[in-house]
Amino acid sequence: MGRVIRNQRKGAGSIFTSHTRLRQGAAKLRTLDYAERHGYIRGIVKQIVHDSGRGAPLAKVVFRDPYKYRLREEIFIANEGVHTGQFIYAGKKASLNVGNVLPLGSVPEGTIVSNVEEKPGDRGALARASGNYVIIIGHNPDENKTRVRLPSGAKKVISSDARGVIGVIAGGGRVDKPLLKAGRAFHKYRLKRNSWPKTRGVAMNPVDHPHGGGNHQHIGKASTISRGAVSGQKAGLIAARRTGLLRGSQKTQD
């Protein structure tokens, strides 16, 4: 009988849980309220900070609480061009400036936005990584829908009430610089999770992995595996719709 393979061990957590001790906190938009739905609310960028394990910087933005006499600090993903002391306006009637938060229905076609909500009020789900952005393709006022192009190139239709931040997420070009050394990769993943270094299955013994063993390193069978396979067999291309080289012109789904 074989051993418990790596992906089975990951499911149990333990040493594979993410390293969150040095994180600044969850980066989200403001909770959707009356001020944002019908007008705007003003905040100020107090600080731009590094977040461990994240490629993009974070901005700590302070808003007045609309219901109580106090200040509320929100953590936004910083956009390129945002600076400390800058006023951030959030709401339907906010101006079209970098860093401001607006519903997609109030943003003209061709505008670049980031940290876009998938559903109104979820506080940001799309285009959140460094250098990422979403492009507004068009609006359908009759159905209150907006069509956008995601960083992957796929197109998606979402509600025009979903909010986004004007501009591109800061930290673009991060992946263009090669790591070059194993030591740099070590420090990178030390703050993320236990996912490095990753031993190949064909380099293992047959007891450790479905691809292990043999007089030379080869998988020895088709690497596609069914969705209904038991967890100890799930290694390789799991439930792949297709495999191999993409030939000809690629079409993005409309």
Curated annotation (Swiss-Prot):
Which gene is the coding source of this polypeptide chain?
Answer: RPL2A
For this protein, the record's PROSITE patterns field holds: RIBOSOMAL_L2
Q: What is this protein called?
A: Large ribosomal subunit protein uL2A
Single Gene Ontology BP annotation: cytoplasmic translation
Taken from the UniProt entry, a GO cellular component term is: cytosolic large ribosomal subunit
- Covalent link location (Glycyl lysine isopeptide (Lys-Gly) (interchain with G-Cter in ubiquitin)): K46, K93, K119, K145
Compartments it resides in: Cytoplasm
Query: Could you tell me which Gene3D superfamilies the record lists for this protein?
Result: 2.30.30.30, Nucleic acid-binding proteins, Ribosomal protein L2, domain 3
Q: What else is known?
A: There are 2 genes for uL2 in yeast.
Q: Cite the record's note on assembly.
A: Component of the large ribosomal subunit (LSU). Mature yeast ribosomes consist of a small (40S) and a large (60S) subunit. The 40S small subunit contains 1 molecule of ribosomal RNA (18S rRNA) and 33 different proteins (encoded by 57 genes). The large 60S subunit contains 3 rRNA molecules (25S, 5.8S and 5S rRNA) and 46 different proteins (encoded by 81 genes).
Q: Which PANTHER family match?
A: LARGE RIBOSOMAL SUBUNIT PROTEIN UL2, RIBOSOMAL PROTEIN L2
Write out the GO MF terms: RNA binding; rRNA binding; structural constituent of ribosome
Outline what the protein does.
Component of the ribosome, a large ribonucleoprotein complex responsible for the synthesis of proteins in the cell. The small ribosomal subunit (SSU) binds messenger RNAs (mRNAs) and translates the encoded message by selecting cognate aminoacyl-transfer RNA (tRNA) molecules. The large subunit (LSU) contains the ribosomal catalytic site termed the peptidyl transferase center (PTC), which catalyzes the formation of peptide bonds, thereby polymerizing the amino acids delivered by tRNAs into a polypeptide chain.
InterPro entries found in the cross-reference section: NA-bd_OB-fold, Rib_uL2_dom2, Ribosomal_uL2, Ribosomal_uL2_C, Ribosomal_uL2_CS, Ribosomal_uL2_dom3, Ribosomal_uL2_RNA-bd_dom, Translation_prot_SH3-like_sf
Q: Has UniProt tagged this entry with the keyword Phosphoprotein? A: yes
Q: Which SMART domains match?
A: Ribosomal_L2, Ribosomal_L2_C
Q: Which family does it belong to?
A: Belongs to the universal ribosomal protein uL2 family.
Does this UniProt record's set of keywords contain RNA-binding? yes
Using the record's annotations, give every residue carrying the modification Phosphoserine: S52, S95, S159, S160, S249
Identify the species of origin: Saccharomyces cerevisiae (strain ATCC 204508 / S288c)
